[in-house]
């Protein structure tokens, strides 16, 4: 089984763990722990799929000034690198955690990218010679501000023309326009549903209504609902309780496992397991197995 992952806004994800909660400013913390992993939503998806045994090709954009960590990571997991290199550096994001709380700093991707940049070149580079039939492409993450919001719609249409199954996980205008191209599967979270259906679903009836509205344009709909679980075409799967370390790759791991296995319970268990890992690192499969028993 071959999966292609398109990541236009990769990141180096750092997690800094403080020993206690900040008290309002001025503190100096010396006893801290820090982990760093390369990521970006589609990179997180690619990594989990590779761990599950899939053939994975990953592409999109990488800053040429600091691509070496990504090259090492992709090689480590046997993921084929078809990223386009652009001038500058790939962004670095931070998750700062302490007992009982956290905050996240997300920086913009490729702020120096020209508005004339040929964004479809990234999709075409990922596809290569397009000789693979029956593949699945996961288009995931935000877009650099220089790129048009309609890019994902163009990408979905392009990959569909190759006969590939298309999966879209984005937000805002990029997701709204991408939905118009009729992807096979989408995965918004509850808050990301608002610009798509006009409300944030909170009750069972509202999740059912949101799913029904979204399935007018998408083949299948997964709506993640944070620590409570996720809705798969209107069916709720509750998440097991875990000690949360970092939620960076939880939704990405859930989506990747669902694309791999098609099993909602496995997907929720994988997403929950990802919350126990720092900096977006993939969870051990034995942890997923254990959590699956509680789903």
Task: Set out the residue ranges of the language-model regions.
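Short beta-strand scaffold segments in enzyme catalytic cores
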Residues: 47, 92-96, 229-233
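Conserved post-catalytic alpha-helical subdomain immediately downstream of the catalytic base
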Residues: 216-227, 240-295
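Conserved phosphate/ATP/ADP-binding segment of small-molecule kinases
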Residues: 149-234
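Short pre-catalytic strand/loop immediately N-terminal to key active-site residues, enriched for Gly-Thr
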Residues: 29-37, 237-249
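Short beta-strands and strand-loop turn motifs
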Residues: 104-106, 134-142, 169, 187-190
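Conserved N-terminal subdomain of the carbohydrate kinase-like
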Residues: 50-135, 290-295
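Glycine-rich phosphate/adenosyl-contacting loop at the front of the ribokinase-like
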Residues: 1-59
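Hydrophobic anchor at the start of a short beta-strand
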Residues: 3, 54-56, 81, 166, ...
């Amino acid at each position: 089984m071959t999966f292609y992952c398109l990541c236009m806004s990769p990141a180096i994800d750092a997690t800094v763990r403080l020993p206690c909660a900040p008290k309002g400013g001025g503190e100096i913390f010396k006893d801290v722990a820090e982990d760093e992993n390369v990521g970006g939503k589609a990179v997180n998806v690619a990594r989990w799929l590779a761990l599950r045994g899939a053939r994975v090709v990953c592409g999109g954009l990488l800053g040429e000034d600091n691509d070496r960590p990504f090259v090492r990571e992709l090689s480590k997991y046997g993921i084929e690198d078809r990223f386009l290199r652009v001038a500058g550096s790939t962004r670095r994001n931070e998750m700062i955690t302490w007992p009982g709380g956290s905050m996240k700093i997300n920086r913009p991707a490729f702020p120096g990218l020209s508005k004339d940049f040929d964004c479809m070149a990234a999709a075409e580079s990922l596809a290569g010679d397009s000789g693979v039939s029956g593949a699945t492409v996961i288009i995931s993450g935000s877009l650099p501000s220089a790129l048009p919001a309609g890019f994902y719609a163009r990408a979905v249409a392009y990959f569909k023309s190759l006969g590939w199954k298309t999966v879209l996980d984005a937000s805002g205008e990029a997701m709204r326009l991408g939905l118009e191209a009729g992807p096979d599967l989408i995965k918004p979270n509850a808050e990301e549903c608002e610009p798509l259906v006009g409300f944030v679903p909170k009750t069972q009836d509202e999740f059912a209504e949101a799913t029904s509205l979204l399935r007018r344009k998408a083949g299948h709909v997964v709506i993640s609902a944070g620590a409570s679980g996720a809705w798969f075409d209107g069916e709720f799967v509750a998440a097991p309780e875990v000690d949360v370390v970092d939620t960076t790759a939880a939704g990405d791991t859930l989506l990747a496992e669902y694309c791999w296995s098609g099993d909602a319970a496995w997907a929720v268990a994988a997403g929950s397991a990802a919350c126990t890992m720092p900096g977006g690192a993939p969870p051990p499969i034995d942890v997923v197995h254990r959590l699956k028993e509680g789903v």
